[in-house]
Amino acid sequence: MTPLSSADTLTLHGQTFASRVLLGTSRYPSLQSLSDSIAAARPGMVTVALRRQMNAGAAEAGFFELLKRHDVPLLPNTAGCQTIAEAVTTAQMAREVFETDWIKLELIGDDYTLQPDPVGLIEAATLLVKDGFKVLPYCTEDLVIARRLLDAGCEALMPWGAPIGTGKGIVNPYGLRVLRERLPDVPLIVDAGLGVPSHACQVMEWGFDGVLLNTAVSQATHPEIMARAFARGVEAGRAAYLAGPMDARESAHASTPVVGMPFWHQDGSHA
């Protein structure tokens, strides 16, 4: 797949990425399936969970070698953290292990919905930004929280579409669209809850800057095919946004213009 133009690239923290797809690396049926999915999606970044990888043992011995072969920028995350101290410590460890100051900040406040802890998220983001991290916080579509995260020094946000792993798509279209409208110059990556490529296409049509996928791909019957489908959906949605879609209207409008009367009506001989 080719980009719409060489100029239409995703830019985060001053760094450009050729793809607007970010791909998670957890819960694939095999390392080969993960490798095939990365090749199919051609993501701009792949996320890695330090806590999960450290506990994976010998079964995942080839995981990091696989990532090196694909040569895709890594975005470590703080998945599984429930306190500010856990998140900050995990981020610092990830910086040492992966040799990057990029971090996707996850701080879960509820085990049932896996909803982010908004108060802790802001405090953790503040600490990590001061420590030199490029923080991409996983948050909800709450506009006030989003602004507080920006005030804390975050330059891009990752609002959810729906709770992690549900595949429900966009549960609050109004909230996400308002977030996009009110923060027009902030990179926004929709993260979590997307289930099928049409969900990704939809948010890209609304002007979001990218999507992060994991469960929708890794738990598909054929992950590689789904990864490719999502990449195409993202590209289609982005193209539609740039094309400038027509406004929806309440009344019908003929698509073919009518000028004058048909020639066979003009002589009055028609039945």
UniProtKB/Swiss-Prot annotation:
Binding positions (1-deoxy-D-xylulose 5-phosphate): G165, A192, G193, N214, T215
Compartments reported by the entry: Cytoplasm
Domain of life: Bacteria
Enzyme class at the top of the EC tree: transferase
Keyword 4Fe-4S appears in the UniProt entry: no
Catalytic activity of the protein: [ThiS sulfur-carrier protein]-C-terminal-Gly-aminoethanethioate + 2-iminoacetate + 1-deoxy-D-xylulose 5-phosphate = [ThiS sulfur-carrier protein]-C-terminal Gly-Gly + 2-[(2R,5Z)-2-carboxy-4-methylthiazol-5(2H)-ylidene]ethyl phosphate + 2 H2O + H(+)
EC number per UniProt: 2.8.1.10
GO molecular function: thiazole synthase activity
Subunit structure: Homotetramer. Forms heterodimers with either ThiH or ThiS.
Protein name as it appears in the record: Thiazole synthase
Source organism: Burkholderia mallei (strain ATCC 23344)
